[in-house]
Amino acid sequence: MGFQIEGVIPALITPFTDDLKGINEEGLRENVSRLLEAGVHGVVPAGTTGESSTLSHAEHRRVIEIVVDEVNGKVPVIAGAGSNSTREALELSTYAEDVGADAILSVVPYYNKPPQEGLFIHFSKIAEAVECPIILYNVPSRTGCALEPETAAKLAEEYSHIVGVKEASGDLDVVQRFIEETPDDFILLSGVDELTLPILAVGGVGVISVTANVAPELMVEMYEAWKSGDVERARELHYELLPLHRALFTETNPIPVKAAVELVGMASSPPRPPLKEAREDTKELLRRELKKLGLLPEGG
């Protein structure tokens, strides 16, 4: 397996124009630049946090293109390229590969609830269409069905460039089953910020993170502390960050994180309908937690 990634990988928000009808391209570039300066280990454009479900196909492609260009090889770009239509997932995946994404993140098809055999067919077709590394994305709370570890193991055995999984079930037992069932070099990335440290402890190698949009340095510090063997410091940071992790999920993601990104002075916007702007009590909670961590700009 050639592709390796570990560490803190922000799942980028997509900032929209004021009327929500277009992408704030300059703001997206500024956000990526800020996160690179903070030392993140990769980025994910056009995922759940990036509102892929309400991007047009042209916008989805453009977001990937912008991020690949702005990153310019500094860290891996893992492009969100999933869909509940296998045909559309193929189109997005081949486009992401063509414009230079280092890997693709391919979500379990949502809404139509395929059986495991259907998931195997879906991901097999994607693997046969691209040569770039593929990271599977298991998030049953958003998709309505789960990728079983045994299915992931079959896919990894059949296709050497299916290299890992973003595991966002929130169930540590499921995480451990993925690690037990898949090859030793299969990458497991946490998809739940508050479980990052526990998942590292059982064999995960990093996190595709919502929190890292607003607290990238702290997330990187926690990971680096763990990696260097300073478990006590990693644990301290884990508990310091927990209230913020929780605050970022008091409403449907990415409603809170888009408010938080604005609070820390980065480019943001409300989400597109059918999501909406964060409630005032959510904004106040976020403001308090960000302030505790010293993340608000002066006067914020």
Curated annotation (Swiss-Prot):
Subcellular location per the Swiss-Prot or TrEMBL entry: Cytoplasm
Family annotation (Gene3D superfamilies): Aldolase class I
Residues bound to pyruvate: 49, 208
UniProt-listed SMART domains: DHDPS
Family annotation (PROSITE patterns): DHDPS_1, DHDPS_2
InterPro entries per record: Aldolase_TIM, DapA, DapA-like, Schiff_base-form_aldolases_AS, Schiff_base-form_aldolases_CS
Site (Part of a proton relay during catalysis): residue numbering on this chain: 48, 111
This protein's UniProt keywords: Amino-acid biosynthesis, Cytoplasm, Diaminopimelate biosynthesis, Lyase, Lysine biosynthesis, Schiff base
Gene Ontology CC terms: cytoplasm
Annotated EC: 4.3.3.7
Domain of life: Archaea
GO biological process terms held by the UniProt record: diaminopimelate biosynthetic process; lysine biosynthetic process via diaminopimelate
Name of one Pfam family that matches: DHDPS
Pathway involvement of the protein, from the record: Amino-acid biosynthesis; L-lysine biosynthesis via DAP pathway; (S)-tetrahydrodipicolinate from L-aspartate: step 3/4
Main localization of the protein described in the UniProt heading: cytoplasm
Catalyzed chemical reaction(s): L-aspartate 4-semialdehyde + pyruvate = (2S,4S)-4-hydroxy-2,3,4,5-tetrahydrodipicolinate + H2O + H(+)
Annotated catalytic residues: 137, 166
GO molecular function annotations of the record: 2-dehydro-3-deoxy-phosphogluconate aldolase activity; 4-hydroxy-tetrahydrodipicolinate synthase activity
Family: Belongs to the DapA family.
Assembly behavior: Homotetramer; dimer of dimers.
NCBIfam families, alphabetized: dapA
Purpose of the protein: Catalyzes the condensation of (S)-aspartate-beta-semialdehyde [(S)-ASA] and pyruvate to 4-hydroxy-tetrahydrodipicolinate (HTPA).
Protein name as annotated: 4-hydroxy-tetrahydrodipicolinate synthase
Organism: Methanopyrus kandleri (strain AV19 / DSM 6324 / JCM 9639 / NBRC 100938)
Gene this protein is translated from: dapA
